[in-house]
């Protein structure tokens, strides 16, 4: 039976819309998911279409946005690509990779996307919704919108917002960020641009990131409710940033919290950075201060530097060379520096990058084969097919430990013979997952394909101890707090804060 015929049987979905990008939709959905889980419900997150290079791989090898994976953790369930059936991974110049139900199906421009992919995209969204309800008929979907639901030039082909809300007859919440100012115009303007049948779906308004004396907003609350005839069901106070921003542009505003830390880490801010959630576990280490490196500089102030993943490795390697950062990294290595590359970062640490199918940002035949930074004797060749899979392995360095994570990458990396480069060893029992070298004069160079490597507590502890030892700092013998337990604690705290200030019960019937 089609889902349309069963809509009267399902639990009323809750949909979180926003007056703009960055209004707080993702965190609101995460909080509601945990609140409902604690109430004994079966919440499942859903976002029809997301645009992000911060991705996760489910247990079937399907790519999905990391924010929906995080929301699944808040529900206490395994993430699935069905929760984010369309993922667009931007590559610059209005070009994106299109992923349907976890599988890459092509590259498109913004103009061609709406022309060629709108109808197939809506079918994929409906297919995912039907599958979710078939597998878990008693679930309650907690749906996240994208950007603003009333972009008038796009609304007729918007797959993520009001089309989904109307299809499921969802109870909708409109979230707005008072921190940005103009909250009255944002709320009224958004609602005025909706059709009457769309506005009827809005059952509550949330004012997010409120600072100061709440009593001073009493008249404002009364005015909004009188003007819209929609109750304000929550005024959420300003909270410390608990999770990474969904958009890499927001990294420019993100600062590490641990200003008295003993270990200083520099992460290279690549133009096409991906999977910056890899560094959340380091952000939660009190002994570590993270700084994002955006321009050429002397890197000696850092105890180790990280070259992160990239959506366009060739393009980002060219950027490193032209900006001078490639030379900075070499000089840092020559001065006993410690370096670790993840995925695209591993590839850039090698001697050469070859892109015969123009998959990784090369724009001409001259860019199809370029030199890497040249610190590891590795050659990477990019192929048309992308590898996405969950990983379970065992590390050989800096400790023997079980390792979990996932891979998302094009290309195969191979060792090359070189008398001028250091000999390298495998980091893991699965030999093609990463390599390292320890230089006689001091310093290490390592690279791995495993995203989520720092979520492995023992591996992270021992790598940090290796750095501490190089600084003549006492090593930590006590195990650090499990990152996954810490993540659970953060989600619980987030849900508790929302629960204090949010009347969710009115939306459950």
Swiss-Prot record:
Keywords assigned: Cobalamin biosynthesis, Glutamine amidotransferase
Pathway the protein acts in: Cofactor biosynthesis; adenosylcobalamin biosynthesis
Active site: 343 (nucleophile), 451
Keyword Coiled coil: no
BP GO terms, sorted: cobalamin biosynthetic process
Keyword Ribonucleoprotein: no
InterPro entries in the record: Class_I_gatase-like (IPR029062), CobQ/CobB/MinD/ParA_Nub-bd_dom (IPR002586), CobQ_GATase1 (IPR033949), CobQ_synth (IPR004459), GATase_3 (IPR011698), P-loop_NTPase (IPR027417)
UniProt-recorded Gene Ontology molecular function terms: ABC-type vitamin B12 transporter activity; catalytic activity
PROSITE patterns assigned to the protein according to its UniProt record, in alphabetical order: GATASE_COBBQ
Boundaries of every GATase cobBQ-type domain copy: 262-459
Pfam short name (any one): GATase_3
UniProt cross-references to NCBIfam families, sorted A to Z: cobQ, PRK00784.1
Family (UniProt): Belongs to the CobB/CobQ family. CobQ subfamily.
Free-text function comment from the UniProt entry: Catalyzes amidations at positions B, D, E, and G on adenosylcobyrinic A,C-diamide. NH(2) groups are provided by glutamine, and one molecule of ATP is hydrogenolyzed for each amidation.
Protein name as catalogued: Cobyric acid synthase
Source organism (scientific name): Prochlorococcus marinus (strain AS9601)
């Amino acid at each position: 039976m089609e889902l349309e015929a069963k809509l009267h049987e399902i639990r009323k979905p809750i949909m979180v819309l926003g007056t703009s990008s960055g209004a707080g939709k993702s965190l609101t959905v995460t909080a509601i998911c945990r609140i409902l889980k604690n109430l004994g419900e079966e919440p499942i997150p859903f976002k029809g279409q997301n645009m992000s290079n911060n991705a996760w791989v489910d247990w079937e090898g399907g790519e999905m946005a990391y924010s929906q994976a995080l929301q699944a953790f808040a529900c206490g369930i395994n993430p699935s690509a069905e929760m984010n059936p369309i993922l667009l991974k931007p590559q610059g110049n209005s070009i994106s990779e299109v992923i349907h139900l976890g599988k890459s199906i092509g590259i498109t421009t913004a103009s061609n996307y709406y022309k060629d992919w709108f109808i197939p995209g809506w079918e994929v969204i409906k297919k995912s919704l039907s599958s979710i309800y078939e597998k878990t008929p008693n679930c309650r979907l907690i749906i996240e919108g994208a950007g603003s639901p009333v972009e008038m030039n796009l609304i007729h082909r918007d797959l993520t917002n009001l089309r989904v809300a109307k299809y499921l007859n969802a109870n909708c919440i409109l979230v707005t960020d008072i921190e940005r100012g103009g909250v009255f115009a944002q709320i009224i303007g958004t609602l005025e641009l909706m059709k009457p049948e769309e506005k009827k779906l809005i059952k509550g308004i949330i004012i997010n990131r409120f600072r100061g004396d709440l009593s001073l907003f009493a008249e404002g609350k009364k005015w909004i409710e009188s003007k819209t005839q929609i109750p304000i069901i929550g005024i959420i106070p300003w909270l410390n940033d608990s999770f990474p921003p969904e958009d890499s542009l927001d990294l420019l505003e993100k600062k590490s919290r641990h200003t008295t830390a003993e270990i200083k880490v520099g992460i290279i801010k690549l133009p096409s950075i991906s999977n910056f959630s890899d560094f959340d576990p380091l952000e939660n280490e009190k002994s570590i201060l993270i700084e994002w490196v955006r321009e050429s500089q002397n890197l000696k102030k850092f105890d180790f530097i990280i070259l992160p993943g990239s959506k366009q490795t060739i393009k980002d390697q060219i950027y490193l060379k032209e900006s001078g950062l490639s030379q900075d990294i070499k000089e840092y290595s020559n001065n006993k520096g410690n370096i670790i590359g993840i995925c695209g970062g591993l590839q850039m640490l090698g001697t050469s990058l070859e892109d015969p199918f123009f998959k990784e940002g090369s724009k001409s035949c001259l860019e199809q084969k370029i030199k890497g930074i040249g610190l590891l004797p590795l050659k990477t060749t990019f192929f048309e097919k992308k590898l996405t899979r969950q990983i379970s392995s065992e590390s050989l360095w800096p400790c023997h430990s079980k390792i979990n994570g996932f891979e998302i990458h094009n290309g195969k990396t191979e060792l090359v013979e070189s008398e001028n480069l250091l000999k390298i060893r495998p980091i893991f029992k699965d030999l093609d997952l990463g390599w390292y070298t320890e230089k006689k004069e001091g310093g290490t160079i390592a690279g791995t394909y495993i995203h989520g490597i720092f979520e492995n507590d023992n591996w992270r502890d021992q790598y940090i101890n290796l750095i501490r030892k190089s600084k003549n700092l006492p090593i930590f013998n006590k195990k650090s707090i499990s990152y996954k337990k810490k993540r659970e604690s953060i989600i619980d705290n987030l849900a508790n804060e929302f629960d204090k200030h949010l009347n969710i019960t009115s939306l459950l019937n």
